[in-house]
Design a protein with these regions (language model features):
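A short, N-terminal "cap"/entry segment at the start of jelly-roll beta-barrel domains
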Residues: 1-40, 45-47, 146-174
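Conserved metal-binding segment of the jelly-roll/cupin
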Residues: 39, 78-99, 107-108
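A short beta-strand-loop-beta hairpin characteristic of the jelly-roll/cupin
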Residues: 50-81
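Structural motif
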Residues: 63-65, 102, 129
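Residue-level recognition of conserved beta-strand positions in structured domain cores
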Residues: 68-70, 97, 105
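A short hydrophobic beta-strand segment most commonly corresponding to one strand
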Residues: 99-118
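Short cysteine-rich clusters marking metal-coordination/redox-active sites
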Residues: 121-126, 160-163
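Short Cys/His-rich "knuckle" micro-motifs
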Residues: 130-137, 168-174
Length: 174
């Protein structure tokens, strides 16, 4: 069991860990039921995370935006400093954090469950689905990187079958 600690002090001492490209740190790696992460900005990811369980966002410093794919449309949800938001399960979402922002995110642990994760990309021009992965999540700090690299290495994956637009390569992942 981990003893109580001062979260603000932890953030001050560990800001250097909350940097691109993914910017998150799991605070309770041995927890059995929940992933409790501190996430920093800026981030510039274009993928949409898919989680078969709810996610709780609590914005500690600065404001952020969560883009969500709802009924085939890109919706924008703003979470201001001090606000919290419970994202329902099964909604592809892209949390966008500007520079100098910090948030707390709580998700269910998926190891030992039949829940899977996903990463989805949508066309910047017409919002048509480009490519997606579904996979069992074992380590929230590292499992996405392999899929990012594979997606950005493939022009076919990045090319919209609807309008022909090609998503730019994110150089951090090639």
């Amino acid at each position: 069991m981990m003893l109580p600690f001062n979260l603000q002090q932890w953030i001050e001492e560990n800001r250097d860990l909350l940097k691109p490209p993914i910017n998150n740190k799991n605070l309770y790696k041995q927890a059995g039921d929940f992933i409790v992460m501190i996430v920093g900005g800026p981030n510039a990811r274009k993928d949409y995370h898919y989680n078969e369980s709810e996610e709780l966002f609590y914005q500690l410093e600065g404001d952020m935006t969560v883009y969500a794919q709802i009924d085939g449309k890109k919706e924008e949800i703003t979470i201001k400093e001090g606000e919290m938001f419970l994202l329902p399960a099964n909604i592809p979402h892209n949390p966008v954090r500007p520079e100098n922002t910090i948030g707390l995110v709580i998700e269910r642990v998926r190891i030992g469950t039949d829940l899977s994760d996903g990463l989805f990309w949508f066309c910047d021009k017409c919002n048509h689905p480009l490519h997606h992965y579904r996979f069992p999540l074992t380590n929230i700090e590292t499992d996405f990187l392999t899929r990012f690299k594979e997606f950005y290495a493939s022009e076919d994956y990045r090319t919209c079958k609807n309008c022909g637009d090609v998503m730019e390569v994110d150089e951090r992942y090639v």
